[in-house]
């Protein structure tokens, strides 16, 4: 969708002309709410579009050598996702807290002295014959003739920071979260039938989001809170 079209669709949900929309991630939704004064909320996480590491002159990550070059997108969000993926695969280490705003200046450890070549996202795939590896999002990988499912050497998983942040969601107007129609829509888009369709149709460029990733994160937070509460209770008992 164009930015103008997506704005229209969000306003139609706000006005009640539409019940829901499904084409955006939460940071985009939150930004729109803040800017436009709307009241849209997320009711279901459906899919994400993973970044992947693809072969250039090297065909496997085990072939990485000292001084190799890896091409990544140069815009803020996409570069951060690329760097996080490289970190997840042991190629670099980023400074603590760099997260989804990371840049090459946040690289804390680079044991192979890898050179990061920053390019416009649409240019990255074109330099594959000249660099060891390229890091691409799904649509540019498909445009370059890669099969995301077959050719990516590594890709973002549902439990990655990027996937949990940039998962595409169903959005509704606040107050309509418990509507039976909305619940049915969410259940349908989370069904095994839809997951199978996504997997078959998009060849890995779009991946169904697994709610277990969020559940695991919630469990960790709950465990922390429980531990803190137990500690306070123990201290009070001791007093």
Region locations from a protein language model:
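A conserved helix-loop-strand patch within extracytoplasmic ligand-binding domains
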Residues: 43-92, 195
């Amino acid at each position: 969708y164009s930015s103008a079209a997506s704005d229209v669709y969000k306003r139609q949900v706000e006005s009640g002309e539409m019940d829901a929309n499904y084409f955006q991630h939460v940071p985009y939704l939150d930004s729109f709410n803040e800017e436009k004064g709307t009241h849209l909320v997320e009711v279901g996480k459906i899919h994400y579009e993973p970044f992947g590491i693809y072969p250039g002159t090297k065909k496997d990550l085990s072939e990485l050598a000292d001084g190799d070059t890896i091409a990544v997108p140069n815009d803020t969000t996409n570069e951060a996702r690329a760097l996080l993926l490289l970190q997840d695969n042991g190629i670099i280490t980023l400074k603590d807290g760099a997260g989804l705003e990371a840049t090459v200046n946040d690289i804390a450890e680079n044991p192979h002295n890898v050179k990061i070549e920053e390019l416009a996202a649409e240019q990255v795939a074109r330099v594959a014959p000249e660099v060891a590896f390229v890091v691409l999002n799904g649509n540019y990988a498909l445009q370059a003739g890669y099969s995301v499912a077959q050719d990516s050497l590594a890709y973002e998983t549902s439990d990655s920071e990027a996937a949990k942040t940039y998962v595409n969601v169903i959005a509704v107007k606040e107050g309509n979260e418990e509507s039976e129609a909305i619940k049915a829509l969410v259940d349908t888009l989370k069904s095994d039938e839809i997951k199978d369709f996504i997997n078959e149709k998009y060849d890995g460029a779009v991946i169904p989001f697994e709610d277990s990733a969020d559940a695991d994160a919630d469990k960790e937070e709950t465990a922390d809170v429980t531990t803190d509460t137990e500690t306070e209770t123990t201290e009070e008992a001791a007093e």
